[in-house]
């Protein structure tokens, strides 16, 4: 039986930093099932006391201490949380103290510093990249491809849209995507809209059985979702990628984070921010 533990990601800001680092660390423990709870904007002692009650309830229910990842700046609020029956990992204290020593400087200990608009010059790049991904989704527009950093190509429902949006949000990458249709495959060549941008193309493919399952959620029992159709499209699009010398990866067993990282490395595209 798989062990179960509760994990809290607690912050006086958005909770993004605590959640991102906490998720990465917990992923290393594959034999433990974690109930993950994000609690942003715990910015008063009253809210912290309410959190202590939640943590203690989880400890009693699980029969084990919850794991707490926090990025709380205020020492008084942290002191309240420390009274809980949880195992606390103070992310700022863990990393900032050694950095202060190395840099011979005091940190600002500012709430929400890494994700605030006022202190983040990348905010508009992020918004523009997301708008670009949405405007150029699914081959809807092709006349802005000259402004794209990347153009993802592949069969319908292989993961192009979420990958484009993730790269936009996380790295400010302007990524368009174009679905290759049965008609495109029958021509045995790239669509005209893509030919002059071949250097920007990256292919996504997927296992036919997985594609069938995804398409059946959208159009059950249709030819579009049949295994025979999915197998045909995947086979033909992979043949097209090889013929046109377009790099591609199979998205079946990778997360959107892994897919995005592999694409950027393969294409040598620099992230606008990190």
Curated annotation (Swiss-Prot):
Name by which UniProt lists this protein: Putative phosphoenolpyruvate synthase regulatory protein
Molecular function in Gene Ontology: ADP binding; ATP binding; phosphotransferase activity, phosphate group as acceptor; protein serine/threonine kinase activity
Tree of life domain: Bacteria
Family: Belongs to the pyruvate, phosphate/water dikinase regulatory protein family. PSRP subfamily.
UniProt cross-references to InterPro entries, sorted A to Z: Kinase-pyrophosphorylase, PSRP
Keywords on record: Kinase, Nucleotide-binding, Serine/threonine-protein kinase, Transferase
Function per UniProt: Bifunctional serine/threonine kinase and phosphorylase involved in the regulation of the phosphoenolpyruvate synthase (PEPS) by catalyzing its phosphorylation/dephosphorylation.
Catalyzed reaction equations: [pyruvate, water dikinase] + ADP = [pyruvate, water dikinase]-phosphate + AMP + H(+); [pyruvate, water dikinase]-phosphate + phosphate + H(+) = [pyruvate, water dikinase] + diphosphate
Pfam families hit by this protein: Kinase-PPPase (PF03618)
Enzyme class: transferase
HAMAP family attached to this UniProt entry: PSRP
NCBIfam families, sorted: PRK05339.1
Organism for this UniProt entry: Pseudomonas aeruginosa (strain ATCC 15692 / DSM 22644 / CIP 104116 / JCM 14847 / LMG 12228 / 1C / PRS 101 / PAO1)
Binding residues for ADP: 154-161
Coiled-coil residue spans: none
EC number: 2.7.11.33, 2.7.4.28
């Amino acid at each position: 039986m798989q062990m179960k533990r509760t994990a809290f990601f607690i912050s006086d800001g958005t909770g993004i930093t605590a959640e991102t680092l906490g998720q990465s660390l917990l992923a290393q423990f594959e034999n433990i099932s974690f109930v993950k709870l994000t609690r942003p904007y715990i910015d008063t002692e009253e809210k912290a006391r309410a959190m202590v009650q939640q943590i203690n309830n989880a400890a009693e229910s699980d029969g084990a201490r919850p794991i707490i990842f926090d990025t709380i700046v205020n020492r008084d609020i942290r002191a309240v949380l420390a009274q809980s029956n949880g195992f606390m990992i103070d992310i700022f204290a863990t990393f900032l103290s050694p950095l202060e020593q190395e840099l011979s400087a005091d940190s600002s200990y500012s709430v929400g510093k890494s994700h605030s608009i006022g202190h983040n010059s990348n905010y508009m790049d992020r918004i523009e990249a997301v708008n670009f991904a949405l405007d150029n989704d699914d081959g809807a527009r092709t006349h802005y491809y000259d402004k794209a950093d990347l153009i993802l190509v592949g069969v319908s429902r292989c993961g192009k849209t979420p990958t484009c949006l993730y790269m936009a949000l996380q790295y400010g990458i302007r990524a368009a995507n174009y679905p290759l249709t049965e008609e495109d495959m029958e021509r045995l060549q790239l669509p005209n809209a893509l030919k002059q941008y071949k250097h920007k193309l990256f292919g996504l493919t997927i296992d036919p059985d997985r594609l069938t399952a995804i398409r059946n959620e959208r159009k059950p029992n249709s030819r579009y979702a049949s295994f025979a159709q999915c197998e045909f499209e995947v086979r033909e699009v992979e043949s097209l990628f090889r013929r046109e010398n377009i790099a591609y990866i199979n998205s079946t067993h990778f997360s959107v984070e892994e897919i995005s990282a592999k694409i950027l490395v393969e294409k040598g595209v620099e992230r606008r921010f990190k």
